[in-house]
Amino acid sequence: MKKNIILNLIGLRCPEPIMIIRKTIRDMKDNEKILILSDDPATKRDIPNFCYFMEHKLLKNEIKVKPYRYLLKKGL
């Protein structure tokens, strides 16, 4: 069974968001999705890079207004 997760990281600053995202994704199955909410400006750079290097798919990002929203899918 696939599950979709919402991860509220508002108020956390680098490196905490990426550490929590990595731990959460580790427990997910391939193709499960996670919606991440954050207000840390560093996530605009860190999350796309994390997805690239860890081979996950960044499906959508909304970074014009806070909270920033990122939709990721585990795996490619």
Curated annotation (Swiss-Prot):
Q: Which residues form the active site?
A: 14 (cysteine persulfide intermediate)
Gene Ontology CC terms, in alphabetical order: cytoplasm
Q: Where in the cell is it found?
A: Cytoplasm
Keyword field:
Cytoplasm, tRNA processing
* Gene Ontology MF, one: sulfur carrier activity
One BP annotation, GO:
tRNA wobble position uridine thiolation
Among InterPro entries, the record links this protein to: Sulphur_carrier_TusA (IPR022931), TusA-like (IPR001455), TusA-like_sf (IPR036868)
Q: Does the keyword Cytoplasm apply?
A: yes
Q: Which family does it belong to?
A: Belongs to the sulfur carrier protein TusA family.
Annotated protein name in UniProt:
Sulfur carrier protein TusA
Species the sequence originates in: Buchnera aphidicola subsp. Acyrthosiphon pisum (strain APS)
